[in-house]
């Protein structure tokens, strides 16, 4: 059986209740290795510890070329705010075939469900 994909949630300034319900969290934990950090941006140490295994990144985590070079498995970066901060090397992400998506500005249940659906489909190469 294939290893479960690592989905990394770093959705500051969104809180846990805005990102997923307990049911969604439980389902994500069944199909993926789920790491999340709430209350502030994830510390660089936490990101660096997991960067090589992250397949789906949800949040505003800085992803310059140097970090993208380390992220061998990443398939998608899903922004949770209504902006496009210059903290991602968008050109390099595009060159590598990494999807950069946005669920912002709404964090309504339908949008959250769409993000979960994107994460599942990307993790299964659909």
Labelled PLM ranges:
Residues 1-54:
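N-terminal glycine-/charge-rich "phosphate-binding" loop or analogous flexible N-terminal tail
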Residues 55-126:
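Phosphate/diphosphate ligand-binding glycine-rich loop within oxidoreductases
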